[in-house]
């Protein structure tokens, strides 16, 4: 029996079109200039496919590798460069250190008594033991550490939610909502959507749950002025159905996944579109 056809979804393209059409001119830290709106939300049903943008080719290796790096708790760009990923190069210091960025806050949030909190391990434990909790949250926005970071967190806060089984023999469904305080729509947001969708799949596998929705919520949602031509090109393209994600093994813990454990199939996409990064 053939698998049912996957629907074509355009949440991301609709978002981009909305900001490009209705955004206001606004300055920014980089001096580039943006077109911006405040507040937007997208919802992706992870059972309909893996939400990897199709109107341009997205570099999946960088997304997977960066997420695995976050989960190590490392602050070193060397870890990424050793694996051929250069997306953090513009912010790395001479010694390769990035300060207490995402992974450090996820895995080693410092406490006043000199200890550390592993937020990710706490999430896994809570999903397994108290799935109805409304406190299954990870924050990267550590106010005391912001000035030490090479780049302050853009995707700053996320929460998990388990919908209970609806019938005997079913499993609960895991959803995730991200709050992204600063959203570079052309370059950054496609990475962020796919990264947190992947993390939701990994968490679900580790906690014996099905996947539900990924909800992306943005604060300052902007298109840089030097991305306008690229955005017009991308919006001229028709999206394809999302690909499917396959996790090829179940490791002993969330922290034992390897790059080769993930396979994205049937990724139909338009050609890549290059654009400068605002630093």
From Swiss-Prot:
Similarity field: Belongs to the thymidylate synthase family. Bacterial-type ThyA subfamily.
Keywords of this entry: Cytoplasm, Methyltransferase, Nucleotide biosynthesis, Transferase
CDD domains named among the record's database cross-references: TS_Pyrimidine_HMase
Catalyzed reactions per annotation: dUMP + (6R)-5,10-methylene-5,6,7,8-tetrahydrofolate = 7,8-dihydrofolate + dTMP
Listed InterPro entries: Thymidate_synth/dCMP_Mease, Thymidate_synth/dCMP_Mease_dom, Thymidate_synth/dCMP_Mease_sf, Thymidylate_synthase, Thymidylate_synthase_AS
Gene3D superfamilies reported in the protein's UniProt record: Thymidylate synthase/dCMP hydroxymethylase domain
Subunit annotation: Homodimer.
Protein name: Thymidylate synthase
Top-level taxon in the UniProt lineage: Bacteria
Enzyme class: transferase
Active site: 154 (nucleophile)
Record field: transmembrane: none
Pathway given in the UniProt record: Pyrimidine metabolism; dTTP biosynthesis
General function of this protein: Catalyzes the reductive methylation of 2'-deoxyuridine-5'-monophosphate (dUMP) to 2'-deoxythymidine-5'-monophosphate (dTMP) while utilizing 5,10-methylenetetrahydrofolate (mTHF) as the methyl donor and reductant in the reaction, yielding dihydrofolate (DHF) as a by-product. This enzymatic reaction provides an intracellular de novo source of dTMP, an essential precursor for DNA biosynthesis.
Residues reported to bind (6R)-5,10-methylene-5,6,7,8-tetrahydrofolate: 59, 184, 278
GO cellular component, as recorded: cytosol
Subcellular location: Cytoplasm
Primary location class: cytoplasm
Annotated EC: 2.1.1.45
Chain sites annotated for binding dUMP: 29, 134-135, 181-184, 192, 222-224
GO MF entry, a single one: thymidylate synthase activity
GO biological process, one term: dTTP biosynthetic process
UniProt keyword annotation of Cell cycle present: no
